[in-house]
Amino acid sequence: MKVLIAGGGTGGHINPGLAIAKYIKQKEAEADITFVGTKKGLETKLVPREGYPLETITVRGFKRKLSLDTLIAIKELIQSFFQASRLLKRIKPDVVIGTGGYVCGPVLYMAAKKGIPTLIHESNAFPGVTNRLLERYVSYVAISFKDAEKYFKNKKKLVLTGNPVREELLNSGRDKVASNLGIVEGKPLIVAMGGSRGARRINETIADMLNNYFKGEFNLIFATGEAQFDDISSTVKIDEKYRDMVKVVPYIYNVDQVYVASDLMICRAGAITISELQVMGIPSILIPSPYVTANHQEHNARSLERDGGAVVILENELNADLLYKQICSLIFNKDVLKKMSKNTSKNRVTDSAEKIYHLIKEII
């Protein structure tokens, strides 16, 4: 079976594709899987690391406001359909899967027009524009939240699968990996990250907290995002006796190990992040991005908060004092953390990749 997976831009679009690819390989070792993205997305790093070939086309989003940049983006979009057509002709996939990002538009559309079985996966409760446009052309739409149903017209194409997460998250043990991370024993581990691209407000707040409040109460792995790493890491000034407890990194590649060892997460509220927290049962302080369509991250965050698995801090309310006090109020109360962990896990889905695999086999 030849499989082409289109997805890119952020980890939230790429990691579900990697999870699907890994499951396919487990079921069919001889499966030939290729990814397609753009040259500017995180896929250029994540996909090769997992051993899959990556093809690229040129496409990006654009605003409706007329400008030179918009005209260039429209030109690239038109060209991307021809690039996608040539790619499909060369690879000859048996099925094409879209997991999000602008690259899905031309690739999935051209595949459907060529009669190739197609499937898109929508990770959010509020679907993106590209997936809503593709609905009429593809064979199936795999959705992760029941709330997403109302945004699609053809209900017969919808299948509730949940978000596929990496198998490593399901099969790891804390004791086995904690020592590999070099964390100080006897102290809880906090993991803070603002998504694959980083989040300026979160980064600056955590740097402020480390400089002015932190007294070695916990271990911290702080992922800034590659674009902001040099700037943020240079501002962090930690007392020498606490330096072994803090690791400032641009990106967490071994995130499965970090998840397993963590006691509390500080992060955005993207759909894939929420699903991974649920699978792992990790309590969290969620800071939803205010810069996303229809404010869908706050909806995600409030859902987990209602379940009792998370504390939500809006970005416009975020400051170092508030964050520090919230962290301490949780990590020094093990009963609260234990209850939050249980509440986080109660709506977890662990067989999403399997469900998507069965859809693939149905349409080819």
Swiss-Prot record:
Function, in words: Cell wall formation. Catalyzes the transfer of a GlcNAc subunit on undecaprenyl-pyrophosphoryl-MurNAc-pentapeptide (lipid intermediate I) to form undecaprenyl-pyrophosphoryl-MurNAc-(pentapeptide)GlcNAc (lipid intermediate II).
Gene symbol of the encoding locus: murG
Keywords: Cell cycle, Cell division, Cell membrane, Cell shape, Cell wall biogenesis/degradation, Glycosyltransferase, Membrane, Peptidoglycan synthesis, Transferase
Substrates-to-products reaction catalysed: di-trans,octa-cis-undecaprenyl diphospho-N-acetyl-alpha-D-muramoyl-L-alanyl-D-glutamyl-meso-2,6-diaminopimeloyl-D-alanyl-D-alanine + UDP-N-acetyl-alpha-D-glucosamine = di-trans,octa-cis-undecaprenyl diphospho-[N-acetyl-alpha-D-glucosaminyl-(1->4)]-N-acetyl-alpha-D-muramoyl-L-alanyl-D-glutamyl-meso-2,6-diaminopimeloyl-D-alanyl-D-alanine + UDP + H(+)
Stored InterPro entries: GlcNAc_MurG, Glyco_trans_28_C, GlycoTrans_28_N
Uppermost EC category: transferase
Subcellular location: Cell membrane
Cited NCBIfam families: murG
GO cellular component: plasma membrane
Recorded topology in the membrane: Peripheral membrane protein
This protein's name: UDP-N-acetylglucosamine--N-acetylmuramyl-(pentapeptide) pyrophosphoryl-undecaprenol N-acetylglucosamine transferase
Gene Ontology MF terms in the entry: UDP-N-acetyl-D-glucosamine:N-acetylmuramoyl-L-alanyl-D-glutamyl-meso-2,6-diaminopimelyl-D-alanyl-D-alanine-diphosphoundecaprenol 4-beta-N-acetylglucosaminlytransferase activity; undecaprenyldiphospho-muramoylpentapeptide beta-N-acetylglucosaminyltransferase activity
Entry's family note: Belongs to the glycosyltransferase 28 family. MurG subfamily.
Pathway field: Cell wall biogenesis; peptidoglycan biosynthesis
UniProt key word Membrane: yes
Record GO biological process: carbohydrate metabolic process; cell division; cell wall organization; lipid glycosylation; peptidoglycan biosynthetic process; regulation of cell shape
Tagged with keyword DNA repair: no
